[in-house]
Amino acid sequence: MSDAQQITLIVDGEETKVTTGTTGAELFFERRDVVVARVNGELKDLDQPLPEGADIEGVTIDSPDGLNVLRHSTAHVMAQAVQQLRPDAKLGIGPYITDGFYFDFDVAEPFTPEDLKALEKMMLKIINQNQKFVRRVVSEDEAREAMKNEPYKLELLGKKNNAADAGEGVNVEVGAGDITIYDNVDRKSGDSVWCDLCRGPHLPNTKLISNAFALTRSSAAYWLGNQNNQQLQRIYGTAWPTKDALKAYQERIAEAERRDHRKLGAELDLFSFPDELGSGLPVFHPKGGIIRKAMEDYSRQRHVDAGYDFVYTPHITKGHLYEVSGHLDWYKEGMFPAMHIDAELNEDGTVRKPGQDYYLKPMNCPMHNLIFRSRGRSYRELPLRLFEFGSVYRYEKSGVVHGLTRVRGMTQDDAHIYCTREQMKDELTTTLNFVLGLLKDYGLDDFYLELSTKNEDKFVGDDATWDEATRTLAEVAEASGLELIPDPGGAAFYGPKISVQAKDALGRTWQMSTIQLDFNLPERFELEFQAADGTRQRPVMIHRALFGSVERFMGVLTEHYAGAFPAWLAPVQVVGIPVAEAFNDYMFDVVDQLKAVGIRAEVDISSDRFPKKIRTASKDKIPFVLIAGGEDAEAGAVSFRFRDGSQDNGVPVAEAVQRIVEAVRNRTS
């Protein structure tokens, strides 16, 4: 074989010579777990020839990218099954998502649970046929001919040149570069039995999907995520490399459903979502109010200790404030409509005094800037750390509102820090350490950081300032010792940010705190301080939300603890259960001693039998149950019963009180 017939590749870091035209499938023939190739950083189907000098990496089915390909291919098989069972179904979009996939369909009747079972059977039949996924590059005319009976696909072809901004999931189907169609090809006849407009890549064949998949639910969804468009039916599913992995995922989902904060909120009488108030507007019941107050009180004290100044701002403002801040230019769709008020009319109906537009506050930062600007500021006052539990209102679409974690009315634990450029690095370091320490106090301790950097097409300020700020944030993040994940181009237009990602008890990731530099608002509000040399200078502005919102954080903690809050947060910390009515007075005396030292305690004097009272305390997830009978009363003692069912008998009352006080003070249990 001559050199002319060979090309050189870098395969998994090593130089390799192969025959011209070699495909990924041939290169990784002996590695059955490789399902696509990463070629110069881009994922490619295994049947594509590899170019000279390319850097090649085999992507396995159990890797993050491999799982995405598996799920995308399973979505295609599901769509094929739908059109076999419902030939009138029109195809929408079908991307992979976290842990699964979905596909949208325009159908006459919504899908039922029985339909999903029938679809799973049809999918297994397709999978066992070992159909090949074959990529085909086509012209736009050829694509339109192939998709002539698919109106939504024809619409997507018209969006090819602006796919990134065209709507939900469009760039999975079309985008820059070639137009491609993927055929599902019958292994025996070689004929295409189904096809879809898609950018890929896909598995080599359907057999690799095996039986480790499941269709999980169906729901309504608007075409391209726009509520003004046609309503379609969406089927969700999941797929994994093995049946064991699928089972483990299903067990995690079942546990997540048991921990769902909406379910626990009702069971534990913490909060509710009355229809009379509207979507995304929760109310907190007395027990939920206790938890929320304990969360806020602890945070408030920690902020005082860290040198923050508390401020309060109103819920509404004249619209001009958000013209100055730019929110009406950049964020109006996320705001509630204006209230036009204060107009005065003459008797004949003519306007004597024009009215003004007022808005519900979506952000606290413009008002905090007014506080900073309310008088002259000196460098000696900096850093100035303003903090507020500020109520804000955002017009979230009803389809994305979800329990406490996505609401329309929320309370942000919002801080804005003003400092000199020389103070910026130390202040960012202090802020990040403060954030991580406080989150740990609430029971979250598994973190990584994400650094969002400049979007080259959408930013204010100069490159040098952005570069310095980004470099400083990166240094601060790296010094924390936590994993740092880059988010290229993910920053808001006004500055780079660090976001703290926290994992809960189920291993799910939640974005918690953000630390955001802002080059925009100090300019817009003309914020200044007098520097040591007498000149007027702009302060560096740092936005910092620790919980995100109190509501969202409470939802996260409810699921993290499965409703079994640590004693310091629990609405009822102790329940006393006398073994018989004769010992009620004794138990009331014990509970009074606990109340005297600030413990939330009560006695169960219901008519229920003793075993039922124990079960009730367990169901209500009470941290400590104190039990007293004759021997306890004579000895001045109680029996401790813990959440795990273990029990410590004959504990002197004074010791019991001290144990509970220490557990609450130390935020344990």
From Swiss-Prot:
Disulfide bonds listed in the record: none
Protein name, per record: Threonine--tRNA ligase
Residues annotated for Zn(2+) binding in this entry: 365, 416, 543
Alphabetical list of InterPro entries matching this protein: aa-tRNA-synt_IIb, aa-tRNA-synth_II, aa-tRNA-synth_II/BPL/LPL, Anticodon-bd, Anticodon-bd_dom_sf, TGS, Thr-tRNA-ligase_IIa, Thr/Ala-tRNA-synth_IIc_edit
Catalytic activity: tRNA(Thr) + L-threonine + ATP = L-threonyl-tRNA(Thr) + AMP + diphosphate + H(+)
Cellular localisation: Cytoplasm
GO cellular component, one term: cytoplasm
Source organism, top-level taxon: Bacteria
Keyword flag Cytoplasm: yes
Alphabetical list of NCBIfam families matching this protein: thrS (TIGR00418)
Taxonomic source organism: Arthrobacter sp. (strain FB24)
Region (Catalytic): 260-566
TGS domain sequence ranges: 3-60
Coiled coil: none
Required co-factors: Zn(2+)
Role summary: Catalyzes the attachment of threonine to tRNA(Thr) in a two-step reaction: L-threonine is first activated by ATP to form Thr-AMP and then transferred to the acceptor end of tRNA(Thr). Also edits incorrectly charged L-seryl-tRNA(Thr).
Biological process (GO), any one: threonyl-tRNA aminoacylation
Subunit and partners: Homodimer.
Keyword annotations: Aminoacyl-tRNA synthetase, ATP-binding, Cytoplasm, Ligase, Metal-binding, Nucleotide-binding, Protein biosynthesis, RNA-binding, tRNA-binding, Zinc
Similarity comment: family membership: Belongs to the class-II aminoacyl-tRNA synthetase family.
